[in-house]
């Protein structure tokens, strides 16, 4: 499953109303650490296909979503379960660290 582009229009449907955990990557094209994290997020998306959704929010295109969740630094990765943010990480993280965030949120993994 490819990553989902999250916008203010689809945030409620794709994230808040999701029956599976959702990992959301807040990023920007000009952000070096975001570009480093992008292939890690893509790998996580492939590995957790069918078990979790993986979404990306471009903070330049969706400033309202970034503000709603207090995103001050990027990349910021948040995991949502049952409509609530359950885990947050700021800055570049390894694949193992990102996977651990999902595992902490759900016992499905």
Question: Which sequence ranges carry the predicted segments?
Answer:
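Structural microenvironment flanking redox-active thiols in thiol-disulfide oxidoreductases
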Residues: 57-66
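Conserved Rossmann-like nucleotide-binding pocket used by diverse enzymes
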Residues: 2, 7, 27, 53-55
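Non-catalytic, surface beta->alpha helical segment in thiol-disulfide oxidoreductase systems
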Residues: 79-109
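A short beta-strand-turn-helix
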Residues: 3-22
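Short pre-active-site segment immediately N-terminal to redox-active cysteine/selenocysteine motifs
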Residues: 19-20, 26-30, 73
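Conserved redox-active cysteine motifs that mediate thiol-disulfide chemistry
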Residues: 26-40
């Amino acid at each position: 499953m490819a990553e989902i582009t999250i916008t203010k229009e689809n945030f409620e449907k794709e994230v808040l109303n999701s029956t599976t955990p959702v990992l959301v990557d807040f990023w920007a094209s000009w952000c070096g650490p975001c570009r480093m994290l992008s292939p890690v997020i893509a790998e996580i998306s492939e590995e957790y296909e069918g078990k979790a959704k993986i979404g990306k929010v471009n903070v330049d295109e969706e400033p309202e979503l970034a503000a709603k969740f207090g995103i001050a630094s990027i990349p910021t990765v948040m995991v949502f379960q049952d409509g609530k943010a359950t885990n947050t990480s700021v800055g570049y993280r390894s694949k193992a660290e990102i996977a651990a965030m999902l595992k902490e949120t759900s016992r499905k993994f």
